Amino acid sequence: MPHIKICECNKNGLGHLCNCPNGKHTPTSRKIQGLIALMRPFTLITPFFAAFVYAYVILGLGIFEPHNLLLIITAAFALALLNAISNAINQLSDIKEDKINKPNRPLITQDLTELDVFTFVCYGMLIEILILTILGNIRFALAIIGILFFAIIYSLYPRTKRLFIWNNLTIAIPRGLLGAYAIFSLFGIFATSNPYCYAGLAIAVTIFVFGGNTTKDIKDETGDKQAGIRNFVTVYGVKKAMELTCVLTATSIILLSILAWYDIVPKGEQFLIVLLPLSFVYCMYEKWKYSKFGLWNYFYVHFMLVLVVGALLWHI
C-alpha cells in the first residue's frame, strides 16, 4: 500500500483553508500574497496617478467636482486593473525566463498555479467590461481594448517581447499614446485650449516610456539571453542601453519644455527641464555602478515625478 503523506494543514485542522494543486498544499494566506505579488502593486500606482494628471490637464481644479472625481477614480481604477491583468499575462508566458530572472515570482514559488493566474485574468476582464458598460464611452472602451491587445501580442502571440525594438514599442504605445487617449476621451480630446495638447503630451510620454522600459531589462539580462530575447540590453549591453535611456529621457523632457514654450501643452511643463540633471546623474551613476537592481523602480518614480510636477505647475 503506497505511503500517503498528510498535509500539515489537515493535521492542524486547517484543511479548509488551503488549496492543493498537484498534491502540494498552498495555504490561503500564501495565495493572497501570491495574488498581490502577481499584480505587482508598485507598477499600478503610475497609471492610477497618470489618470488624475491627464484629467487635470483638461479640467484643472474641476477634477474635484464630485461627478468628475468619481469618473476619474473609476477610469484610473480601470487603467490600474488593466495593468495588473497585463502583469499576470506576462508572468504566465515568462515562466521559463522567470526561473532564472525572478525565482521569487508566485508561479515559480508555486504559491499560485497557472489556473489561478488564468482565473484572475478572466475575473479582471469581467470587471473591466462592467466598468466600460457603466462609463458608456466608446472611445475609452476602444483605448482599453487597444491596451489589452498590446499586452497580448507582447506576451503571447506573436510575443513581441522577443523582437528588437518592437518589445519597447509595444509597451510604450499603450502606456503613452493609448493611456493618455483613454483619459482625454472621457472629457473630449479637444476640451483644452489647444487641440494639439493631447498629441504633444502623448508623444512625449511615449518616448519617455520607450526609453525607460529598458531599465527593467537590466536585471533580466541573463535569462533573456538564454531565451533568445533581443532588447537594447541583450543586443548592446547594459552601458550602451543606459546611455540610450538617458538620451530618450532627456528628449521627452526637452520636447515637453519646447511644447510648453509654444503653449501647445500647459506652461508648467516647461519647468520639467529642471529634472534633466536628475535624469542624467542617476542614469550615469547606474551605468558605471553596473547595478542590476532598483533602476526599474526609479523609472516609475521618475515617471510619476514628471507627470505630477507638470500638473502642479499648470498655472505658472
Where are the regions a protein language model picked out?
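Multi-pass alpha-helical membrane architecture of UbiA-family
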Residues: 2-316
